[in-house]
């Protein structure tokens, strides 16, 4: 896993087109304060080939998670938001601009730090 800083977020989300039409693969609770979210998404740096991206949220402050069986039903046509607000990293389904709008998402995570890993589709 590579650390992702708040200054890299814009480039990172642009690279994956804000996860539009991505597929949520899994949500893994590693510990009460660490949660890993895995998505299949298209990578603009690889001619839009599909890859797997895992996001590991550490120091989780708040979250709304779904059962594994529900992940395939999440509408990702508008993508997801990955933002840095109030000194926290936040991920939420759809277009969100701050933590309070993220909390309206069907799935969201708010944490102190973020790491990522790329893998095969």
Question: Residue locations for each model-derived region?
Answer:
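Surface-exposed, interaction-prone regions used to assemble/regulate multi-protein complexes
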Residues: 1-121
């Amino acid at each position: 896993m590579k650390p992702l800083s708040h200054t890299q977020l814009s480039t990172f989300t642009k690279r994956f087109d804000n996860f539009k039409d991505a597929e949520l693969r899994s949500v893994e609770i590693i510990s009460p304060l660490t949660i890993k979210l895995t998505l299949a998404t298209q990578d603009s740096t690889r001619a839009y080939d599909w890859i797997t991206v895992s996001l590991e949220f550490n120091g989780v402050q708040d979250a709304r998670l779904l059962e594994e069986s529900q992940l395939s039903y999440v509408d990702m046509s508008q993508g997801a938001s990955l933002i840095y607000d109030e000194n926290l990293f936040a991920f939420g389904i759809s277009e969100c601009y701050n933590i309070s709008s993220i909390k309206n998402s069907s799935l969201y995570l708010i944490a102190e730090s973020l790491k990522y890993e790329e893998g095969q589709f």
